[in-house]
């Protein structure tokens, strides 16, 4: 079935439990003052079509993870620090397609506090704004931002970041690429705020960056 929602005051769709999307569903969030979909537990996308436009995060899991095995999700956000997918735990993508376009400063296509695993599907992320100075730090836009480790064993990833100091993939842990296709383009200029500075980077890992296979193309 189909559902069209507008969040005039807060989140458009919210749940204290998990949210699951199956084949045949068609969910449209026309707009939301905060998050498009906000859940305290996990989000499971097994099929269907999600078209979400929000000021805040398009999909946020406050205390859970995100799993995607199929379907299509088109995610658009406008606020600063608003993300396409935001998970406080792991994100696992094995199928389906995600198209994330985030317009605010310091926004991310995917923001993952845990580990990110991609074994299939297609991810496209576009960021266009500059870095944001906050709490004595510069926070940049990124197609993917992961606090844990990233493992890519398949799928197609295409990221374009045009804003100042934008990152394609930004990982606090280690990145391992065994297969799949990863294409990253970053064109932003360097951002300087006092003694702080940040430059555009295609792929950045604070831990090890290991490429065992697949195709990796970076223009930065």
Predicted regions and their residues:
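A composition-driven surface/loop motif
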Residues: 1-220
């Amino acid at each position: 079935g189909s559902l069209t929602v507008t969040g005039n005051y807060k989140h458009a769709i919210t749940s204290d439990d998990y949210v699951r999307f199956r084949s045949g569903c068609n969910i449209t969030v026309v707009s939301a003052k905060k998050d498009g979909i906000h859940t305290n537990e996990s989000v499971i996308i097994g099929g269907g079509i999600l078209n979400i436009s929000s000021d805040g995060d398009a999909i946020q899991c406050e205390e859970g993870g995100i799993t995607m095995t199929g379907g299509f999700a088109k995610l658009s956000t406008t606020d600063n620090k608003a993300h396409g997918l935001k998970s406080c735990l792991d994100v696992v993508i094995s199928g389906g397609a995600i198209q994330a376009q985030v317009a605010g400063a310091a926004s991310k296509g995917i923001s993952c506090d845990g580990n990110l695993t991609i074994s299939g599907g297609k991810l496209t992320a576009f960021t266009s704004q500059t870095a944001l100075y906050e709490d004595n730090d510069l926070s940049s836009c990124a197609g993917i931002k992961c606090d844990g480790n990233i493992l890519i064993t398949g799928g197609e990833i295409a990221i374009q970041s045009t804003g100042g100091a934008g990152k394609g993939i930004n990982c606090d842990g280690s990145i391992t690429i065994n297969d799949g296709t990863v294409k990253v383009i970053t064109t932003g200029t360097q951002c300087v705020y006092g003694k702080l500075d940040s430059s555009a980077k295609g792929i950045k890992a604070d831990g090890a960056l290991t490429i065992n296979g697949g195709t990796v193309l970076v223009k930065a």
